[in-house]
Each structure stands twice: as C-alpha cells, then as structure tokens.
Amino acid sequence: MASHSLMSPSPLTSHSLLRSSFSGVSVKLSPQFSTLSRSKFQPLSVVAAAKKAVAVLKGNSTVEGVVTLTQENESPTTVNVRITGLTPGLHGFHLHEYGDTTNGCISTGPHFNPNQLTHGAPEDEIRHAGDLGNIIADANGVAEATIVDNQIPLTGPNSVIGRALVVHELEDDLGKGGHELSLSTGNAGGRLACGVVGLTPV
C-alpha cells in the first residue's frame, strides 16, 4: 500500500511539527493540537450525595408522629423526632429489626442489633445499634428531639432503610434497671406507635 501523508492546512516549520507513523500513515500535527495543557484539567472529586429518610409513626392509640433521618457522606445520622399523643414523661425510642407492620408494631421484631450485643444507652459501647434512648413528652404529650447517632446509617450493609422506628409506653432503663428485660428491651413496655423508614428526596 502506498504511504499517505496528512498535512496541516497552514504552513508550519519543521520544528513545530510532531510526527507519528503507524501502518504506513504519516501524521503531522501542530503541538497546539497534539499537546493538552495539564493546568486546564483537574482531577475529579467524587462527593457522595446526602441521604434523607422519613418514618410516619402510627399505632392503635392516639399516638402518632413523623421522624426524619439525614446523613451526609460517612457522617453520623441526624434524627429529628416529633411525636404527639404521649403521656407526659420519658418514653423508650428504638429502631427495630424489621419494617413489617402486618401485625401492628409487634411484628417489627426486636431492636436492630447487627453486632449481637446487649441493650444499653446510646452512649454506651455495648448497646444495640437501634438503642436510641428516651424521648421526653411535655405536659401536652408532645415529644420533640434531635438525636445524632453513628450506628444507624442510611447506606451500606447496616442501612436502616426498610426497618422500623418504635416509641414505647414506658421509660427505657438503658439496660441498668435490673429487670429481666433490661438487657433486651430496657423494660420499656408496650409499643405505642411505629413507622417504617423509607428514603425521601433530599
């Protein structure tokens, strides 16, 4: 096959040309087209999008509420709680294993506990991941709280999406009450209302 030559349309001096040959083809290009300025190209940085989830709590009583969960990157999850219809005082508040409410809140199963530890306070090293402590209802039965916790991520193998948040009848003793249920449920009594955690637009 005859050799073919591709030339730049404008006159170029020999020192301003780059030559490359392959398969009998000779290519001559101006450096301004063949050389890319590194200063114009910056490495791409990947930023994980923030995640947001919501749970609407309902039960067989007048207790109801809305809980939102937000997380940015690998930071702890922020939980904003507002529940109404409670008796004044402390109420256990937990994340439970399953998002199954076919039999009411009882079918949400035990506390979310991927590490198979005993029940404790949110600040304890030994605790269920779903141990979120107590929320406090005021004289009007309204509980508002903000919880920041690093064991309830919205992504990854231990994601809480599809699990259920539950508010309980009694105060959670945080595993320190000496009751036979202290190290499993905090002896927090019945389940007043629950809601499945689902993703929502940020």
From Swiss-Prot:
Name the Pfam families for this protein.
Sod_Cu (PF00080)
Q: Name one GO molecular function term.
A: superoxide dismutase activity
According to the UniProt entry, what is the EC number of this protein?
1.15.1.1
CDD domains, per this entry?
Answer: Cu-Zn_Superoxide_Dismutase (cd00305)
What this protein needs as a cofactor is: Cu cation; Zn(2+)
List the cysteine pairs that form cystine. C105-C194
User: Does Membrane show up as a keyword for this record?
Assistant: no
For this entry, the transit peptide stretch runs: 1-48
What the record notes about the co-factor is: Binds 1 copper ion per subunit.
Tell me which UniProt keywords the record has, alphabetically: Antioxidant, Chloroplast, Copper, Disulfide bond, Metal-binding, Oxidoreductase, Plastid, Transit peptide, Zinc
Q: Which GO terms describe its cellular component?
A: chloroplast
Main localization is plastid
Q: Which residues bind Zn(2+)?
A: H111, H119, H128, D131
The residues that the entry says bind Cu cation are H94, H96, H111, H168
Keyword field contains Metal-binding: yes
Q: Which domain of life is it from?
A: Eukaryota
Tell me where in or outside the cell this protein is found: Plastid, Chloroplast
What catalytic activity is recorded? 2 superoxide + 2 H(+) = H2O2 + O2
- Family named by the database record: Belongs to the Cu-Zn superoxide dismutase family.
Assembly notes: Homotetramer.
What job does this protein perform?
Destroys radicals which are normally produced within the cells and which are toxic to biological systems.
Protein name listed in UniProt: Superoxide dismutase [Cu-Zn], chloroplastic
> What is the species of this protein?
Medicago sativa (Alfalfa)
